[in-house]
Amino acid sequence: MGLEKSFILFSLLVLVLGCVQPSLVGESKESPSEKFKRRHMDEEGPYQSSPTYCNQMMKDRGMTSGRCKPLNTFVHESWAKVKAICSQDKVTCKNGKSNCHKSISTLNITDCLLMGSSKYPKCDYSTTARQKHSIIACDGNPYVPVHYDATV
């Protein structure tokens, strides 16, 4: 009887730990698609191109922590429109992989380029608003954007 109770209690403990542990670890983990959204999506977008837009956005989105990210592009379109690129023209990515897609239409974007004399921790960026085609890498199930590859 004592052995049965021990087995039942052990089984319950394993069950509880199995349920609790993944949620503790998983909550702070960012999926590739969530990382793409954080780094590249700004649906609201700048209504007017402000010279400080990139400095503020790069800082707010955590891309100047520990180093200055040299280049980043923000897309000012709906998530649905950006996700739809994953079913558009397939092209080869810069790294040679075949999971990139080129947008059929131009997108409203802002390119942030680290200025040459800028050094961490003071990351200064030039801000350039454009309408260009974008090349986006997609992955997963569902097939969603995971990497901004290029502007063309």
Curated annotation (Swiss-Prot):
GO terms, molecular function: lyase activity; nucleic acid binding; ribonuclease A activity
Its EC number(s): 4.6.1.18
Protein name, as recorded: Ribonuclease pancreatic gamma-type
Family designation: Belongs to the pancreatic ribonuclease family.
Location of this chain's protein in the cell: Secreted
GO cellular component: extracellular region
Residues binding substrate: 35, 38, 69-73, 94
Signal peptide: 1-25
Primary site of residence: secreted
Catalysed reaction, written as an equation: an [RNA] containing cytidine + H2O = an [RNA]-3'-cytidine-3'-phosphate + a 5'-hydroxy-ribonucleotide-3'-[RNA]; an [RNA] containing uridine + H2O = an [RNA]-3'-uridine-3'-phosphate + a 5'-hydroxy-ribonucleotide-3'-[RNA]
Subunit structure: Monomer.
Region (Disordered): 26-48
